[in-house]
Amino acid sequence: MKKQVLRIGVGGPVGSGKTALLRQLCLSLRDKYNMAVVTNDIYTREDAEFLTKNDALAADRIIGVETGGCPHTAIREDASMNLAAIDELQARHNDLDFVLVESGGDNLSATFSPELSDLTIYVIDVSAGDKIPRKGGPGITKSDLLIINKIDVANLVGASLEVMDADTKKMRGDKPFIFSNMKTQQGLADIISFIEKEGMLSL
């Protein structure tokens, strides 16, 4: 019987660094785990092509889903295209350990269907300003892990990491969050530890 593959949803607004995170996760984990990726773009397969061109994973381990119209629907109300892509990846590669499912660029109110994602990671970035965490929305408050990316630009945009830290704690309670910079891999080890622990991959 085919084992149930761990599905990790990665969401967040356009430009927050979702694809850069996926690339770093692939480069760091591909030799340790049997993994694959599904990306969602509205009219193109741009993110899937980026990962392939940047040698993140072999091309047959990446499927780009063209959602058309509203990208929220493909990860929430009708996840059938994404579920079919996961089935296809499982058919290609026996005993996958996990699949990363990247949502199309979405807003703070988008969430993954429980049937599509066992663990949800939500990525926001500092360049949008330090008010983003307190705006709330399911991505900020309910994701299993919140990543606050691009901390290197905080001074450039006048954002306070201290304010973001305090607001995020207020909005998330005990739920974890990590400050990161994918260019320098800052925070990456903590993100990987979270995935391994919560996904029970290291057992």
From Swiss-Prot:
GO terms for biological process: urea catabolic process. This is Urease accessory protein UreG. It is found in: Cytoplasm. The keyword DNA damage does not apply. The keyword Endoplasmic reticulum does not apply. The gene is ureG. The lineage of its organism: Bacteria, Pseudomonadati, Pseudomonadota, Gammaproteobacteria, Alteromonadales. CDD domains: UreG. Signal peptide: none annotated. It holds the Pfam family cobW. Belongs to the SIMIBI class G3E GTPase family. UreG subfamily. GTP binds at residues 12-19.
